[in-house]
Regions:
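Extreme N-terminal basic, low-complexity initiation segments
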Residues: 2-9
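Structural detector of well-ordered beta-strand residues that form the stable sheet scaffold
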Residues: 169-171
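A short alpha-helical cap/connector motif
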Residues: 14, 22, 26-28, 33-166, ...
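Activation on terminal intrinsically disordered regulatory regions flanking enzyme cores
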Residues: 1-2, 21
């Protein structure tokens, strides 16, 4: 099974590389940028593509919540994190790069599931708002229902933590950039169930649920 997927991924990367190479001559004809610049950009794009498929392949056995014993956690993975339903709002939210779109759609589903009454304003607001049109976006909140923070933002995390209760959910974005920091958040006595999606982590604070750290293929 693994060799097949490796071959499949390699073929996709080769196809992507050839497609981008085919565009270089057209770009070169229309612009004054050196060919070498576009070649370097193409190489990096293909490398990023390969990395995405490698991450996906390394977590393939963590897909769709299989093996999760808790019905609540399984349902969250299956019907929120990896929900495949083609929401009508997705078409209206298109236009961003692949990672912004991938995370944005997840945030849409989180807002749709959590239905927060109030959230902090951020660059993903249109995704949150599409998921829950009743949400009010403000600069400061008194209680966390659903929030997002970058893994590097230590002060932001502490500020949110002081406003959390058992129903709070925090998305920690970019955990792949600082695994040490993410593992500390997983082990923190203030946190409960956590979900590692590689591109972001989701933290619950419900102490009535058994503390568990899940790695999910997202």
């Amino acid at each position: 099974m693994v060799p097949f997927f490796l071959l499949f991924i390699s073929l996709i990367c080769i196809f992507e590389f050839r497609s981008k190479i085919g565009c270089i001559s057209e770009i070169q004809r229309k612009t004054s940028f050196p060919l070498v610049f576009h070649s370097i950009c193409t190489i990096f794009a293909v490398m990023n593509l390969f990395k995405r498929y490698f991450v996906w392949l390394s977590r393939i056995h963590k897909c769709r919540g299989f093996g999760i014993q808790s019905p609540t956690d399984y349902s969250f993975v299956r019907y929120v994190i990896n929900e495949r339903w083609p929401y009508y709002a997705y078409e209206q939210l298109d236009g961003d790069n692949w990672l912004t779109s991938k995370l944005g759609r997840l945030y849409f589903r989180l807002a749709n599931w959590r239905q927060p009454s109030m959230m902090i304003q951020d660059e993903y607001q249109r995704y949150w708002q599409a998921g829950c049109i009743e949400t009010n976006f403000v600069p400061i909140i008194n209680k966390v229902e659903l929030a997002r923070v970058l893994v590097e933002d230590y002060d932001g995390w502490e500020a949110l933590l002081s406003k959390c209760d058992q129903k709070s959910v925090i998305v920690v974005e970019g955990i792949w950039r600082d695994w040490e920091r993410w593992h500390k958040l997983e082990a923190d006595e203030n946190t409960g169930v956590t979900f590692d999606l590689y591109y972001c982590g989701i933290v619950f604070f419900d102490k009535n649920r058994f503390k568990q750290n899940y790695i999910i293929n997202f």
